[in-house]
Design a protein with these regions (language model features):
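N-terminal glycine-rich FAD/FM-binding segment characteristic of electron-transfer flavoproteins
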Residues: 1-289
């Protein structure tokens, strides 16, 4: 059966490079001051979506993301790997959203897309580590949900079969579509970008990303697929009071970059004297014994 699949993806700050300018005065993350990457677990989710597309002829995969205009890069990265389209939720009213406001915005976007069979995203984003958005989207849409997915085994007869990680093992679950699925980072890694698709979608942008003096501006009329969908709060019939800072009961107080300092090291030999000295030291410090 053909499937309409939406991948929830996020452009996140590279948490390996957090500096002193990481926070704004309002207590939100200053994303403009940090290098941006495709959230790693969302790439795992994208791979599962692309495999479903291959297994079910006629299926489509779209990338849904929320952020400033530069977040369109996430959609391009998805197109380079085999996605068919994308939607960027971008509006100042979306800015500063916590998980509650984010899930509300994404849910309104999914409703506007319409007739979605599977919504799939990473278990959590590396800039928040809450793992809340996927389940909240499912709750807002009233859909079945499965978390900690390792693999979508098959979709047939209107049902999806999914293998998920649990404490001490794995379990296999099955339920009728539509589903909201969150995928672990331990799932299959995403395929690399396809050179032909990079060439095809190199200039794919949303309208807010474009500059009037671009030499390839005429391409957007000749090749409509290069225009990414760009939606505001009004476009998705959203309630401004439930979006961005206005709809966020929580906000980040601070972000700190903690660097673990190396401690003094000792080099020991296999001599009885060194081993005896080490054992006495460990006993004295109550590390063993």
């Amino acid at each position: 059966m053909s499937l309409k699949i939406v991948v929830l993806a996020k452009q996140v700050p590279d948490t390996r490079n957090v500096g002193k300018d990481a926070m704004t005065a309002e207590g939100t993350v200053n994303r403009a001051a940090l290098p941006a990457i495709f959230n790693p677990e969302d790439l795992n989710a994208l791979e599962q979506a692309l495999r479903l597309k291959e297994q079910n002829p006629g299926s489509t995969v779209g990338i849904l993301t929320m952020g400033p205009p530069r977040a369109g890069e996430i959609i391009r990265q998805g197109l380079y790997r085999g996605a068919d389209t994308g939607w960027l939720l971008t509006d100042r009213l979306f800015a500063g959203a916590d998980t509650l406001a984010t899930s509300y915005a994404l849910a309104t976007g999914i409703q506007k897309i319409g007739d979605v069979d599977i919504v799939i995203g990473g278990r959590q984003a590396i800039d928040g580590d809450t793992a809340q958005v996927g389940p909240q989207v499912a709750q807002k849409l009233g859909l079945n949900q499965v978390t900690y997915a390792e693999e979508i085994l098959k979709v047939e007869d209107g049902k999806a079969t999914i293998r998920r990680l649990i404490d001490g093992g794995v379990e296999t679950v099955e339920a009728p579509l539509p589903w909201v699925i969150t995928v672990n980072g331990s799932a299959a890694p995403c395929r690399p970008c396809n050179v032909k698709l990079v060439m095809k979608y190199k200039y794919a942008t949303c309208p807010m990303e474009r500059k009037s003096d671009e030499p390839w501006a005429n391409l957007y009329e000749e090749r409509p697929y290069l225009t990414l969908n760009q939606w505001s709060v009004a476009d998705v019939d959203g309630d401004p009071a439930q979006c961005g800072l206005s709809g966020s009961p929580t906000k980040v107080k601070a972000v700190k970059n903690i660097v673990f300092q190396a401690k003094e090291s000792k080099t020991l030999t296999s001599s009885d004297e060194d081993i005896d000295g080490l054992m006495k030291e460990l006993l004295n410090e109550s590390i063993i014994g």
